[in-house]
A protein has these predicted regions:
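Conserved beta-strand/loop positions that form the S-adenosyl-L-methionine
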Residues: 66, 89
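Conserved SAM-binding loop
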Residues: 99
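Conserved beta-strand signature within the Rossmann-like core of class I S-adenosyl-L-methionine
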Residues: 170-177
Length: 229
């Protein structure tokens, strides 16, 4: 992280949904029975084709950092796993193109180079990853948009049409959120695929993302769900 002080001005999640969504299980089963037939967007197909050549040629551990934002988490994961290939995906070109250098120069030992930041729509990208049979060791989804209104449950990853593909990616899936209910719902949805996970409080000294830093500075508890296969 840089020396810039993180101010605690993040608001708590506001929701009209006090417990897990009553239709979540039904929604997940619907998406299992009726897989998405939406055409793959051209820019995502092109981005996937380019990184797929690198992944297929790599013989080591591959880590996927979904919804990577400005890429801080991707760089940190790459630094923590120097022998791995770390791939960060985000739909926003603006976020991807921001030159964040917290990791590259903080130890005086040069740049971290074992990662790639890719602009792509994850709704399409996940489907391509599954079709190409990428062997992902760890799949991170850090602080996804919570969509806290009950009517928006299908905009949450576990309520989306691509959830069957999401849950297929990675030997270990790691989610973080400041809304514990989001993780509890994801955990329930994963159980439909006979996958188990555990939720724990995060007390890391070094936040993985700018959102995590802001939430912690605001006094909010952040949570992590780990799903093992």
């Amino acid at each position: 992280m840089s020396n810039t002080e993180i101010t605690g001005d993040s608001r708590m999640i506001e929701t009209n949904q006090p417990d897990m969504h009553e239709k979540l299980v039904e929604i997940v089963h619907k998406h299992i029975a009726h897989p998405s037939q939406k055409p793959i967007q051209a820019h995502t197909q092109q981005a996937f084709d380019e990184i797929n050549h690198i992944v297929q040629a790599f013989s080591g551990e591959v880590i996927l950092d979904s919804c990577c934002g400005v890429g801080q988490s991707t760089r940190l994961l790459a630094k923590q796993n120097p022998d791995a290939l770390v791939i960060g995906i985000d739909k926003s070109a603006h976020r991807i193109n921001r030159n964040v250098d917290e990791v590259e120069h903080d130890d005086g030992q040069g740049r971290v180079e074992n990662y790639h930041l890719i602009r792509a729509d994850l709704n399409d990208f996940y489907r391509l990853v599954v079709t190409a049979n990428w062997q992902i060791s760890q799949h991170y989804i850090l602080y996804p948009n919570p969509w806290p209104k009950a009517k928006h449950v299908q905009r949450r990853w576990h309520g989306s049409a691509v959830f069957p593909q999401i849950i297929a990616v990675g030997q270990e899936i790691i989610l973080r959120s400041n809304w514990r209910l989001y993780l509890e719902e994801f955990q329930l949805a994963a159980s439909i695929f006979s996958l188990q996970g555990d939720i724990s409080a995060i007390n890391d000294a070094q936040p993985l993302t700018p959102f995590e830093a802001k939430y912690q500075a605001s006094g909010q508890q952040c949570w992590q769900l780990r799903i093992f296969k």
